[in-house]
Design a protein with these regions (language model features):
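Active-site adenylate/phosphate-handling loop in enzymes that bind or generate adenylated species
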Residues: 74, 85, 272-333, 376, ...
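Short low-complexity, flexible loop/linker segments enriched in glycine and/or proline
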Residues: 252-256, 278-279, 299-302, 473-475
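Phosphate/oxyanion-binding loops and surfaces in catalytic or ligand/nucleic-acid-binding neighborhoods
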Residues: 77, 98-101, 118, 133-136, ...
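Cysteine-centered catalytic environments shared across enzyme families
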Residues: 1-259, 270, 274, 451-452, ...
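Short catalytic/ligand-binding loop motif for oxyanion handling, primarily in non-cytosolic enzymes
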Residues: 18, 67-69, 78-79, 99, ...
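Adenosyl-5′-phosphate
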Residues: 47, 100-103, 129-134, 145, ...
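Donor nucleotide-sugar recognition loop
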Residues: 261-265
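Short, glycine-/Ser/Thr-/acidic-enriched flexible segments
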Residues: 13-14, 63-65, 75, 96, ...
Length: 519
């Protein structure tokens, strides 16, 4: 869209665009949120982003100043890649679009990062010279110079409130935030697993259409829990049961969707539920982000940050002894950072170094570089871990998974629990109101809100989601892994074969499929 000398291209949704439009003078040529964003940027520059509620990635060319500005939403819901060229800058929502210029070399350090994290963290991409704009950042290009700045950083200051006051404010905020995410000219659905986050999302809407996915493996199927929640909430509910053949059919499609190696096995279930829901709706809400916002991960109430357990946990995950960690890691060995990294479950560094061929490994490589820039020394362990999750695995892992798998089916998925107003509010809540470390339980506030809204006993169900029984499938298909590892050795990526341990096996299978698609 054009306004004077400014040209805007934009991907996303601005939920409060009507309110912003009322504050801007116009003149108006349409009723779109794109035009509202363009007028806001023309009037206030990137400072105006503080007023925006939504998910977005955009580029605006300011012709008079001959300046290009890129921006990505606060939490990284929408992606944005860029590539600095000798005579300009190229950008796209998909990495593959930048490969048409020419195909750069694969970044060996990005492969190491992938095996450690399960994804390639921003600002890196799998290719040298192609970058991801980090969440909550802007990039300005002018006369060949690039400046990248963070425009949003939530406060971690705790505010004193009683539990009842906190619940009242939280409920009021959810009543505003969740319905706002249904803004659309088309029907909006809700993904409903057997868990509490998706049920919370559905409970603040009137008779929404809900969609659930189960598997032929009974031990991992969430259909019964989702069905009970849907009945209690009065939703219009639809279910799908996926078979192994559905998973295998999706297996070759996934690497092309992500453009980079991405090892979260839940991507396949997200892909299938999006494909299923798209038959009826083009927009869906999900409960993504509930674990980060309401404190649902076991690490939040564990003792991962204490001195007594750090080394035991790190060594149990295969991290090398302190004498082999390198000076930079030794400085953090008793702060909990290595233990936290190990708890996330990626491939341990010592195993990565043993596995990769010589050209792909680097002596003394700092596998914690991505986490280190967000680690807050001296904070309560819960505050540290939430802050780290918010800035790392949320955008690079969880939200990447949801965006790519849904957009592959032209389905727009919106995560209302990651509305920045809700995130900021929950970061201000006393940790004592969020987790019970003695009883090893999280999501205390969310449980209080949902107790009267769900069937008896539903909140005692084990943590769930649209999980896929990948481990069982891999064990039933040993030749698949064997052939994948053999191909990676032929490419000179691996130095040796591996055993059937799940995380390692799955990461390597995905890496092989990515090389087949792009390498």
């Amino acid at each position: 869209m054009v306004l004077g000398s400014r040209v805007l291209t934009y991907n996303g949704e601005i939920y409060n665009y009507a309110g912003l439009r009322a504050q801007l003078p116009g003149p108006w040529r349409s009723t779109s949120d794109t035009e509202v964003l363009l007028h806001l940027l023309a009037r206030e520059g990137t400072a105006g982003l503080s007023k925006v509620v939504g998910m977005f990635a955009f580029a605006i060319w300011e012709g008079d100043a001959r300046r290009l500005i890129l921006a990505r939403d606060r939490l990284g819901i929408k992606p944005l890649y860029y590539r600095i060229l000798p005579d300009g800058l190229a950008f796209a929502s998909e990495l593959k679009a930048l490969l048409v210029l020419d195909k750069p070399e694969i970044d060996a350090s990005a492969v190491r990062d992938y095996l450690f994290h399960g994804y390639v963290p921003a600002p890196k991409s799998i290719y040298r010279g192609i970058c991801k704009l980090p969440a909550g950042h802007t990039l300005a290009w002018q006369d060949g110079r690039v400046r990248i700045e963070r425009y949003w950083e939530p406060s971690a200051d705790i505010k004193t409130r009683s539990e009842e006051e906190t619940l009242y404010e939280l409920d009021a905020l959810l009543r505003e935030v969740i319905p706002a995410h249904t803004l659309a000219d088309v029907p909006v659905g809700v993904f409903l697993s057997g868990g509490i986050d998706s049920a919370l999302t559905a409970s603040y809407l009137h008779a929404p259409h809900t969609y659930s996915l189960g598997f032929d493996a009974k031990e991992r199927s969430e259909l019964a829990g989702a069905r009970a929640a849907a009945k209690h909430l009065g939703t219009v509910h639809t279910e799908m049961t996926a078979q192994a053949a559905d998973f295998e059919q999706a297996l070759d499609a996934i690497p092309r969707i992500f453009d980079e190696p991405f090892a979260d096995s839940a991507a396949w279930s997200n892909y299938l539920i999006a494909q299923f829901a798209r038959r009826e709706v083009t927009v869906a809400l999900s409960g993504e982000g509930g674990d980060e916002v309401f404190c649902g991960y076991p690490r939040y109430w564990s003792s991962v940050g204490t001195r007594s357990n750090v080394l035991n946990r790190a060594l149990a995950r295969g991290l090398p002894p302190l004498s082999r960690l390198g000076a930079s890691m030794q400085r953090h060995a008793y702060t909990g950072l290595p233990a936290f990294a190990a708890a996330l479950g990626g491939m341990p560094p010592v195993q990565i170094d043993q596995l990769l061929a010589r050209d792909w490994r680097e002596s003394g490589y700092d596998y914690l570089w991505f986490y280190r820039q967000f680690w807050r020394e001296g904070e309560d362990a819960l505050v540290q871990l939430r802050w780290l999750d918010l800035h790392t695995s949320l955008a690079e892992g969880l939200l990447t998974k949801v965006d790519r798998t849904s957009m592959a089916h032209s389905l727009e998925v919106r995560p209302p629990l990651l509305d920045h107003r809700l995130v900021e509010f929950m970061l201000s809540v006393d940790p004592a109101l969020l987790v019970d470390r003695r009883r090893r339980r999280g999501k205390l506030l969310e449980r209080r809100l949902m107790q009267p809204r769900l069937p008896p006993g539903h909140l005692e169900r084990p943590k769930s989601g649209f999980g896929l029984p990948v481990h069982r499938w891999l064990k039933s298909q040993p030749r698949v892994l064997h052939r994948a590892v053999a191909r990676l050795r032929e490419r000179g990526v691996l130095a040796r074969s591996v055993g059937p341990e799940f995380r390692r096996a799955w990461s390597l299978l995905v890496l092989d499929r990515w090389f087949a698609a792009f390498g």
